[in-house]
Amino acid sequence: MDVTRLLLATLLVFLCFFTAYSHPPPEEKLRDDRSLRSNSSVNLLDFPSVSIVALNKKSKQISRKEAEKKRSSKKEASMKKVARPRTPLSAPCVATRDSCKPPAPACCDPCASCQCRFFRSACSCRVLSLNC
């Protein structure tokens, strides 16, 4: 009885595989040469033409200056961020990279959080965001 079930299961899997891969999606169906030629010529005409423009030195310098301004403004914006006030440390807390298995108290660093791996068998406090 087990052999017949095994054979039937194998046959069922083979039939499912065969039916799934024997029918290609509509865009992959084979076509005759005439339709391929007509489609390829139409596709080439559908796309807009590409124009190549040479940049002179002045435009290159302007773009460099604009890029430097953007970089400096981003640096200034990141430096202007106000540091959020840190909560006072509670006496029982776990240091960064130490074990913080669930009955343990919270992490000492306010930017750190307890991350568990391997089905909560190995947990440690880790700092996730560098901007904190």
From Swiss-Prot:
GO biological process: hormone-mediated signaling pathway; melanin biosynthetic process; melanosome organization
InterPro entries documented for this protein: Agouti, Agouti_dom, Agouti_dom_sf
Stretches for region Disordered: 62-88
Places the protein is found: Secreted
Keywords annotated in UniProt: Disulfide bond, Glycoprotein, Knottin, Secreted, Signal
Signal sequence, start to end: 1-22
Protein role: Involved in the regulation of melanogenesis. The binding of ASP to MC1R precludes alpha-MSH initiated signaling and thus blocks production of cAMP, leading to a down-regulation of eumelanogenesis (brown/black pigment) and thus increasing synthesis of pheomelanin (yellow/red pigment).
Domain comment (free text): The presence of a 'disulfide through disulfide knot' structurally defines this protein as a knottin.
Coiled coil: none
MF terms (GO), sorted A to Z: melanocortin receptor binding; neuropeptide hormone activity
Stored Pfam families: Agouti (PF05039)
Sugar-bearing residue positions: 39
Organism of origin: Macaca arctoides
Domain spans labelled Agouti: 93-132
Presence of the UniProt keyword Kinase in the record: no
Top-rank taxon: Eukaryota
Organism lineage string: Eukaryota, Metazoa, Chordata, Craniata, Vertebrata
Feature: compositional bias, Basic and acidic residues: 63-79
Gene Ontology CC: one annotated term: extracellular space
The protein's name: Agouti-signaling protein
Disulphide-bonded residues: 93-108, 100-114, 107-125, 111-132, 116-123
